């Protein structure tokens, strides 16, 4: 049976008391994403509190290195089972895509779609949960009009690989709100799903060029 293999960094002892909660959180994400995305290989997940949080408010964050290796960063004072599960689901979407589609992101458009796919899966996972990360709540509350404005600001850069990643996806500026790349990706992927009559589990491994119909 394919599964996640969980490793916690415990040398400083800060995660020891949360070990059971962390494992349960990851298992919840695994039980949701593995059958939905038809993940048929093992995935190693390293959980650590040794790396500064990119989004401090979330309590948990992640980075997917490959189809079978994910790192989850947590704030052991803020992280809850729900917040960890939500982040793991997001990262499992990245891992699943790489396991079924070996395309690299070659430009800003590809990166936006890559993150948008994971945001859609994450949003579906939390839709009936009262506790959500500030990140996904912000993505879901952003209007179509606001996302169209973001698209207008970024349109000329979509085919370029020379852009400010932190500004587009995280910090924003006077014209782009925080997490613009993620919310635009969510918006475009949702449009793609509507146009193709697909569900996220049918579309997460589609070629990047196919998503151009959402523009």
Which residues does each PLM region occupy?
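Auxiliary, metal-adjacent structural segments of Zn-dependent hydrolase domains
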Residues: 9-67
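Active-site recognition of the HExxH zinc-binding catalytic motif
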Residues: 86-99
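Inter-helical turn/loop segments and adjacent helix faces that build the functional surface
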Residues: 99-108, 128-137, 195, 199-202
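Post-HExxH zinc-binding segment in Zn-dependent metallohydrolases
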Residues: 108-153
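Pan-zinc metallopeptidase signature
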Residues: 152-215
